[in-house]
């Protein structure tokens, strides 16, 4: 009898460890919704911790959308654009409906966005739509842009110029492969 009770306890413990609780993912996501924009987007406890999590891999797109919705009155248009872009990237990388990812990529556009950002977006959309010539044209135009002296990194450091050229080069190198593969298919520095 003791042996049976012990076996039941061990099995129950193993079953609890086998799959993370949906509630724990929801609790993490709910806690993120109260973070500042900077902490939510770039911090170690923000949405990226869900995207890279083996426990909660499907939670990132939903929490990005919910954060945008809850904070829409306080967020600037560029910040809304950035969160929309990240949701599109996560959905594309997860292999979700590609039309949804492309729609979100297009929604990320805003009046007055920097040319480098627009070209990166256009090149990414061209990749998603299987249009290599549009991807190449966006890449070449991005490569020819003059440096933006106002663009700085998070800590005020210089930013690699032009931003995301390596990403478009990777999309070209791995054209036809899934976004999740092509996004990290970048030339060695």
List each language-model region with its residue ranges:
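C-terminal motif of bacterial Sec signal peptides marking the signal peptidase cleavage site
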Residues: 15-16
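Single-residue signature of alpha-solenoid repeat helices
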Residues: 100-101
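Positively charged n-region of N-terminal signal peptides that target proteins for export
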Residues: 1-4
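N-terminal alpha-helical interaction modules that lie
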Residues: 20-87, 141-189
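"A position-specific structural signal for the A-helix of alpha-solenoid helical repeats
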Residues: 86, 90, 121-128
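TPR/TPR-like (Sel1-like) alpha-helical repeat modules
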Residues: 105-110, 123, 132-150
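Hydrophobic/aromatic side-chain positions at a characteristic register within alpha-helices
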Residues: 52-55, 92-93, 127-130
């Amino acid at each position: 009898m003791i042996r049976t009770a012990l076996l039941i306890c061990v099995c129950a413990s193993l079953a609890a460890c086998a799959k993370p609780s949906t509630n724990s993912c929801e609790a993490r996501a709910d806690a993120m919704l109260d973070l500042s924009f900077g902490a939510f987007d770039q911090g170690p406890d923000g949405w990226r911790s869900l995207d890279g999590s083996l426990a909660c891999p499907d939670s990132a797109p939903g929490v990005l959308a919910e954060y945008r919705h809850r904070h829409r009155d306080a967020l600037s248009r560029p910040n809304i654009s950035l969160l929309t872009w990240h949701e599109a990237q996560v959905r594309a990388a997860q292999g979700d409906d590609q039309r949804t990812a492309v729609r979100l990529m297009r929604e990320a556009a805003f009046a007055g966005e920097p040319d480098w950002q627009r070209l990166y977006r256009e090149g990414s959309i061209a990749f998603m739509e299987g249009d290599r010539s549009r991807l190449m044209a966006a890449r070449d135009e991005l490569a020819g842009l003059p440096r933006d002296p106002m663009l700085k990194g998070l800590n005020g450091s210089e930013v690699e110029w032009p931003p995301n050229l390596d990403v478009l080069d990777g999309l070209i190198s791995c054209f036809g492969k899934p976004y999740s593969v092509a996004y990290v298919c970048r030339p060695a520095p």
